[in-house]
């Protein structure tokens, strides 16, 4: 079967890999000049299988209001002039109940745990190097009230069988030795040993090469201009320079899935939530992080690659425009310099921003649509890297008409159309 994948980020390229593995003739198109040029370019680098949590949770509306008034807020809201922004926020608020949280949490954990297994199989199969580490995530709390608040999160971890260890301030240095220098700034910690790290862009670039070896064709600089359909079947996808036909189409366009599929009257509840990152060279390995450190106060993650440190975080709801405000850079620099002052060189940084495709319930959109041959693999929010291989394998199985290894019916767009 001929399959056309829209999007060459980690979701699209991973989908192409599993579709090719299943024996399909696969073509991938993207508007960028290469793979992983947008949301997958410089994300935080966490493979946070264990700490998969919906944004929409009880108490979040109150917390969000408090965050907005911080000098270095983890959440920023700027009206983008659209009614849709308000509609999306209202939808998200409907999921901030204990009942909805449990439903969404179960879906996310199921997807993340499946992705963990897919990464295990993939690495065993390919031996790919993407600067990955399997040394867990260390969440640190700067205030006693944060330690107390974490008890609710720990109860969720226990409910879903996620391994963890609560830490006293001095115990945090067992996992991140460089933090011994700043123990006085830490009130406690939580270690998730099953989490991992890796460079999403490097992974996607390497997977692109493996896909080519399997015969997958890539067409870059292809901006989609039109999608033609006959009844409930997609016929062609047209770009400014080409026309593509396929038996099946997989949409993995991240935030732009919504705008592109609006052409065929599909209403995808995806909003672009902006995140920021800094990448800096390691100057002193002993003073740098070993894996990922998540600063609960600032909602910033600090991740170690081989010779680089990636600092990522924040959530900004302000539309599709990509800007790089110096204030956001200052927040990221403040956190990494406060915890790892001797680890990296802040005079040599790459400052980046990307758009996360977020759904109101924080769960991705995977599977069938009302069109017989149009499938989704999008809407992963902050967990696109974590869920990448699991989502892609699930998508490939659905496209192929195979039984999936995990439940997938409640991940489709239909949950928003009931």
Swiss-Prot record:
GO terms for biological process: D-alanine catabolic process. Its cofactor is FAD. FAD binds at residues 3-17. Its EC number is 1.4.99.-. One of its GO terms (molecular function) is D-amino-acid dehydrogenase activity. PANTHER family: D-AMINO ACID DEHYDROGENASE (PTHR13847:SF280), SARCOSINE DEHYDROGENASE-RELATED (PTHR13847). This is D-amino acid dehydrogenase.
């Amino acid at each position: 079967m001929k399959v056309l994948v829209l999007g060459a980020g980690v979701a699209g390229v991973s989908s192409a890999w599993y579709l090719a593995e299943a024996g399909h003739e696969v073509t991938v198109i993207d508007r960028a000049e290469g793979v992983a040029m947008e949301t997958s370019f410089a994300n935080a680098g966490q493979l946070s299988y264990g700490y998969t949590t919906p944004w929409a949770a009880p108490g979040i509306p109150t917390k969000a209001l408090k965050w907005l008034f911080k000098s270095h807020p983890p959440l920023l809201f700027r009206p983008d002039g659209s009614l849709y922004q308000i509609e999306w926020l209202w939808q998200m608020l409907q999921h901030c109940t204990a009942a909805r949280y449990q439903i969404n949490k179960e879906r996310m954990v199921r997807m993340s745990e499946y992705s963990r297994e897919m990464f295990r199989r993939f690495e065993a199969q390919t031996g790919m190097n993407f600067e990955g580490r399997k040394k867990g995530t260390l969440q640190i709390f700067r205030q006693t009230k944060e330690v107390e608040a974490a008890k609710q999160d720990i109860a969720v971890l226990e409910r879903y069988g996620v391994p963890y260890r609560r830490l006293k301030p001095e115990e945090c240095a067992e996992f991140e030795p460089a933090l011994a220098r700043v123990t006085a700034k830490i009130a406690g910690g939580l270690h998730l040993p099953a989490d991992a790290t890796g460079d999403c862009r490097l992974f996607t670039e390497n997977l692109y090469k493996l896909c080519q070896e399997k015969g997958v064709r890539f067409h870059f600089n292809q901006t989609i201009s039109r999608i033609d359909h006959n009844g409930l079947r997609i016929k062609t996808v047209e770009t400014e320079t080409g026309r593509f036909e396929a038996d099946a189409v997989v949409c993995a366009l991240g935030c732009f899935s919504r705008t592109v599929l609006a052409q065929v009257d599909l209403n995808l509840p995806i909003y672009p939530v902006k995140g920021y990152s800094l990448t800096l060279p390691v100057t002193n390995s002993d003073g740098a992080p070993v894996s990922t450190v998540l600063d609960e106060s600032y909602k910033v993650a600090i991740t170690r690659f081989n010779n680089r440190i990636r600092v990522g975080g924040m959530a900004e709801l302000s539309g599709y425009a990509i800007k790089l405000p110096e204030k956001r850079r200052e927040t990221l620099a403040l956190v990494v310099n406060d915890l790892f002052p001797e680890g990296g060189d802040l005079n040599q940084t790459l400052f980046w921003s990307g758009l996360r495709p977020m759904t109101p319930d924080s769960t991705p959109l995977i599977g069938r649509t009302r069109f017989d041959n149009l499938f989704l693999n999008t809407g992963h929010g902050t967990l696109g890297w974590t869920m990448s291989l699991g989502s892609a394998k699930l998508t490939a199985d659905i496209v192929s008409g195979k039984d999936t290894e995990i439940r997938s019916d409640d991940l489709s767009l239909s949950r928003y159309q009931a």
